[in-house]
């Protein structure tokens, strides 16, 4: 399967949709686009399949006499795309299981057509992980640990900006708390809406918790850890999960679609894997939590201080924030019950995590 993918450096601090069938005319245009772009590579296409064609990120499977390759149009700002392209090349050449990048005829890792960058990758065959199966859950967490470890040492070429979130968490907490406060004004304007009524009744306590969590983070080893990591940072995938991983032959764990990578503490990816998964059950599942953490630590152990930082970050109401944002920013018509479930999960999660801190 295809990836769906400081000297002389600018440092930039950063703060799955369904595919509709393509018309025959659109498919023909996309195939012609691929044929045109591929002229820049030593690739003789025998057949071209459009894999993803209704999004800004386009993906083709290109069949050649020596096997399949993947052509992708990257839907990212150019500076961000370059950071991730060179990161993927670094990891592949280091032996990490990420799709290798095929240079074009000029020796470049990418070609630019219009305002987009195009890249040709190795085509990876494998199956997606099933996270209800313990062995798959362990595999995917071990793959994440290997990714973090292998990424240490990456520095983009001169002129390519560095994308980092190191040291930015306290600001992110503050921003989200302010947004949840501002959204009260939107709820006030919808006083007849049950979702908004519940939001106004309950949200203040969670905003206060978020600010207390920020203070707790600053009192932990978060700051010294980030300062230490800035000297030799690892990458965070930031979108790690079943959509961006594959289990290949001989239990090879492949990490694909590195478009979102950034420098940050490795525990960011752990939190983004563990907390949403447990949220799907409606209860705090200690067994699943421990399976995931133990599998990761079997490849990349964390110190007790590092785990404390992770538990504090997990306390922040990210999942609740996402539900509220869906309502007031994306204007989705959410029922009151969805907010009730989000509030309840935050309470369950907090009770479990406070026993670990």
From Swiss-Prot:
It is found in: Spore coat. The keyword Plastid does not apply. InterPro entries: Aminoglycoside_PTrfase (IPR002575), CotS-like (IPR047175), Kinase-like_dom_sf (IPR011009), Spore_coat_CotS (IPR014255). Gene3D superfamilies: 3.90.1200.10, Phosphorylase Kinase, domain 1. Its main location: other. It holds the Pfam family APH. Keywords: Sporulation. GO terms for biological process: sporulation resulting in formation of a cellular spore. SUPFAM superfamilies: Protein kinase-like (PK-like). One of its GO terms (cellular component) is endospore-forming forespore. PANTHER family: SPORE COAT PROTEIN I. NCBIfam families: spore_CotS (TIGR02906). Belongs to the CotS family. This is Spore coat protein I. It comes from Bacillus subtilis (strain 168).
């Amino acid at each position: 399967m295809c990836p769906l993918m400081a000297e002389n450096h600018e440092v930039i601090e950063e703060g799955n949709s369904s595919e509709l069938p393509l018309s025959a005319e659109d498919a023909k245009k996309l195939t012609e686009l691929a044929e045109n772009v591929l002229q820049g590579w030593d690739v003789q296409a025998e057949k071209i399949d459009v894999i993803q064609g209704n999004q800004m990120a386009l993906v083709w499977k290109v069949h050649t006499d020596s096997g399949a390759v993947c052509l992708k149009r990257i839907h990212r700002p150019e500076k961000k795309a370059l950071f991730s392209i060179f990161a993927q090349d670094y990891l592949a050449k280091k032996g990490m299981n990420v799709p290798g990048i095929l240079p074009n005829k000029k020796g470049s890792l990418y070609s630019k057509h219009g305002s987009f960058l195009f890249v040709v990758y190795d085509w990876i065959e494998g199956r997606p992980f099933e996270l209800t199966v313990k062995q798959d859950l362990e595999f995917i967490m071990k793959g994440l640990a290997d990714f973090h470890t292998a990424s240490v040492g990456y520095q983009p070429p001169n002129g390519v900006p560095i994308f980092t979130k190191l040291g930015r968490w306290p600001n992110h907490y503050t921003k989200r708390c302010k947004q949840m406060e501002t959204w009260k004004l939107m709820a006030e304007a919808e006083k007849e809406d049950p979702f908004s009524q519940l939001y106004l009744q309950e949200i203040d306590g969670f905003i206060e918790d978020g600010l207390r969590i920020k203070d707790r983070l600053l009192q932990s080893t978060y700051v010294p850890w980030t300062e230490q990591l800035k000297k030799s940072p690892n990458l965070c995938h930031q979108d790690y999960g079943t959509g961006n991983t594959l289990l290949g032959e001989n239990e090879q764990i492949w990490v694909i679609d590195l478009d979102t990578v950034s420098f940050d503490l490795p525990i960011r990816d752990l939190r983004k894997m563990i907390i949403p998964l447990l949220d799907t059950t409606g209860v705090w599942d200690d067994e699943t939590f421990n399976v995931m953490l133990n599998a990761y630590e079997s490849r990349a152990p964390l110190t007790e201080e590092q785990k404390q930082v992770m538990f504090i970050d997990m306390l922040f109401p990210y999942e609740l924030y996402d539900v509220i944002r869906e309502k007031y920013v994306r204007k989705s018509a959410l029922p009151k019950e969805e907010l009730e479930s989000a509030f309840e999960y935050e309470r369950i999660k907090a009770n479990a995590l406070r026993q670990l801190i």
